[in-house]
Amino acid sequence: MNYRSTRNNTITKKDKIALLQGLSEDGGLFVLENFNEKKIDLKNLLDKSYTDIAFEVLKLFFSFDESKLKSVIEKAYSKFSTKKVTPLVELKDAHVLELFHGPTSAFKDVALTLLPYLIQLALEGSDQEILILTATSGDTGKAALEGFKDVDQTEIIVFYPKNGVRKIQELQMRTQEGKNTKVCAIEGNFDDAQTAVKNIFLDEDLQKKLGNKKFSSANSINIGRLTPQIVYYIVAYIDLVKNNKINLGDKINFVVPTGNFGDILAGYYAKKLGLPVNKLVCASNKNNVLYDFLTTGIYDRNREFLKTISPSMDILISSNLERLLYDLSGSDDKYIKSLMDELKQNGKYQVNTDILAKLKAEFGSGYASDEETSHIIKKVWEEEKYLLDPHTAVAYKVMLEQNLEGETVVLSTASPYKFCTSVANAVLNITDEDEFKLMEKLHEFTKVPVPENLKDLNSKEIRHNDLVKREDMAKYILEAEKCLK
């Protein structure tokens, strides 16, 4: 199977190389060459388990030995606390797809428990070593660290914005065990970290200094991170059919809290594979660059970066949008390169009227302020005794404003206990207390179970204390890599 760059159709790579490389050498993202020919047969999936469906989806994207692919899928999802992996919960106004039952209580686990196994399959028979570089707005970092911990032939360095993640998210990363893991805070925001990591990927001099080690990514720019996320859209649909909520072939809606555009792009890819989807709704917080883009066709990152109570969505540069635009433009690599060049040079671009019409046909959009987010957390708890985290609450608020036809699924991306300060403030009207005390009080009041991985977090040893300026990240990598040997 071949993948090509969104910015140059002549740059093609075998699937294993695209997976290991993460980002094309021209800065483009890898997309499957014959993706439009790929389809799934939903009828044949009705009696399948989550892991069975994952296998049927992933074999469309990777040419691994099928028995080995099945085996690593089973291993990855055995780490979840429920056999359903991503259970569906019915509320009054929508179904909530719980994506937080993995080892780090965030939706990133769905892909990042599997990605290390996929990389190991791609490395079979090779002495190649991979250095995973990851920028995180909170959840990707811990999920990637946990996934790659002590995995042979890999090392991982995670960068996060020092004041841009919640205390629990930071502690999850700074207490990370594993002889091949490094964590470093940067002075700046997530966009600064992500842009710097992308530039480092393209730094040939730095790559030479690393010798046999090659860079790869655990962010959703890596096709191996993105493709496993397609699975839970299909599984949610199948569950609705099994539960007699819809008939096979009925169209449904998905509302997705979105920052980097990876999660909602996975839904778009599921639709392209044949999933009956009416609308994909992009839900943003006050960093609503995507809302503006989907309504006007103008992408403009030249605005104030706002810190919100949904920090994993505090993003102004949505990397995976490039893959969507490549698809909507009919694989017009030159057009995509021109847009990305405009974004780099001027911080903005405008798509043509044809693409804007397609965007409006495929996607709904909306956004929520912090006050509106808190109100929804309180409202849903009081009315349904269901506890939302702030990111899911953003999506729920946007869902309530949409005039959607058919059943609707809201993607729930994290355990509410990862954001105790915001959730306790909304539900209990308590502020200015230690997050772990708030966790206890929230549990006492709601009786919602606290995930095992979060219970003893405050008693774990701090192992990572590094802090650098964004312009020193490349230098840090060289120093950190010596420590990881």
Please annotate each region the language model reported.
Residues M1-K485:
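PLP-dependent amino-acid enzyme catalytic core
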